Amino acid sequence: HCVIIGFKLSNSTEKTLFEYEDINGQPHVTRAQNINPYLVDAPNVILPSRADTPRGLPQLIKGSQPTDGGHLILTDSEKEELIAAEPNAVQWIRPYVGGVELINSIPRWCLWLKGISPAELRAMPKVLERVKRVTTARTESPTKSVRDFAAQPTLFTQDRQPTTDYLAIPEVSSANRRFIPIAFLTTQTI
């Protein structure tokens, strides 16, 4: 959250930043030389908006998205329970990493059913039940493109899975970090 308390037409020598670890707690008060447009004590440097990747550099893309009502995503315990009940499911389970998981080292998994045959799916009733719930969730979506994907419940609605190992960079991090968290992931990680 950001709240700007006041503006002045004249340049005041007294500038103050208030930061809250807990919005209900007491602020950390910092005297500032200058409060820039990014609301930090730094010179007024404004980064230009850029839609294109600088020439010669690979393009950053958003990762794959299931839009599945959560039914293709598994916690550690759900993964273990599923494999115990249906050992053949192990070949269809992949690590699934979003920004929160990357930053906090939280393990999460997904059912990556790309290429699964109807016979293989029917042989795993618990996986099939999850797929049916994906169909229901997508059918009830207010978004037409998601409803259209109800006919393909085994697939992510947005499949941007790289064919080579890649760098994963969270879309949102924190200005309090000295470094941007980045992970080198294999093609097996969604």
Would you name each region that the model predicts?
Residues 1-2, 106:
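Short, solvent-exposed loop/turn segments at the edges of secondary structure
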Residues 2-14:
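Conserved beta strand-loop-helix elements of the APE1-like EEP
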Residues 15-19:
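Leucine-rich repeat
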Residues 24-190:
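Polybasic, glycine- and aromatic-enriched phosphate-binding surface used to engage nucleic acids
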